[in-house]
Swiss-Prot record:
One of its GO terms (cellular component) is cytoplasm. Its main location: cytoplasm. Keywords: Amino-acid biosynthesis, Cytoplasm, Histidine biosynthesis, Isomerase. It holds the Pfam family His_biosynth. The lineage of its organism: Bacteria, Pseudomonadati, Thermodesulfobacteriota, Desulfuromonadia, Geobacterales. It comes from Geobacter metallireducens (strain ATCC 53774 / DSM 7210 / GS-15). Belongs to the HisA/HisF family. This is 1-(5-phosphoribosyl)-5-[(5-phosphoribosylamino)methylideneamino] imidazole-4-carboxamide isomerase.
Length: 244
């Protein structure tokens, strides 16, 4: 299991939202490329990037910042937010993004996931965001009647590289991830699961490591590494040695 720092982009800056609300944002850095370099220096093996404006608009919005990040670092990246079609996926992969995350598009159009996996094997990740176990889309603005587990099962056999599971109620709230829900999802599918939402201490990372065998491949952390609640270098060292 690896620790994956997040860069959430809004109007070209690194921000963090509380529970996905655009009006509840905190700007942590004006230069995303500098921030990416800092996470790389601290031992990050993968960088998670979200185009927040893109997620709400349904089309890419922070391309210049994304390009600057990719050029600034040598470690691989995964990107989500507003990616709804094959040409957009192709454009981002051509830019140097390692893996593309499909969220709203995956829920609304599973055939897109299947086609993307066929065209770009190993480079498509599905993001499943849930509130009380139900899938939320459109930048979390809309909760559907589909459960996270049912949606995840739909992608078995497609060749999806990973599923990022975010518990919206925990995101940006520094309350710890939803271990039970994350484990239940991981055990229900064969696709590796990356936990997201609420990872806010080394203890949270240790707790996720206890369920690593169920299929947990990583933990995304955002606010905690910006505020210093998690020292990224320490978190990376913890996962490398397999626990405390």
């Amino acid at each position: 299991m690896i620790v994956i720092p997040a860069i959430d982009l809004k109007e070209g800056k690194c921000v963090r939202l509380e529970q996905g609300l655009m009006e509840k944002d905190t700007v942590f850095c004006d230069n995303p490329a500098d921030q990416a370099r800092a996470w790389e220096r601290q031992g990050a093996e993968l960088l998670h990037i979200v185009d927040l404006d893109g997620a709400f608009a349904g089309e890419p919005k922070n391309r210049a910042s994304i390009e600057a990040i990719v050029k600034a670092i040598a470690i691989p990246t995964q990107l989500g937010g507003g990616i709804r079609d094959i040409p957009t996926i192709e454009a981002y992969l051509s830019l140097g993004i390692g893996r593309v995350i499909l969220g709203t598009a995956a829920q609304r159009n599973p055939e897109l996931v299947e086609e993307a996996c066929r065209l770009f094997p190993g480079r498509i990740v599905v993001g499943i965001d849930a509130k009380d176990g139900m899938v939320a889309v459109q930048g979390w603005a809309e909760v559907t009647g589909v459960t996270a587990v049912d949606l995840a099962k739909r992608f078995e056999g497609y060749g999806v590289a990973a599923i990022i599971y975010t518990d919206i109620a925990r995101d940006g709230m520094m309350q710890g991830p939803n271990i039970a829900a994350t484990r239940a999802l991981a055990e229900a599918i064969s696709i590796p699961v990356i936990a997201s939402g609420g990872v806010s201490s080394l203890k949270d990372i240790e707790n996720l490591m206890t369920i690593e065998a169920s299929g947990i491949a990583g933990a995304i952390t955002g606010k905690a590494v910006y505020t210093g609640a998690i020292n990224l270098a320490e978190a990376v060292a913890l996962t490398k040695r397999g626990g405390a």
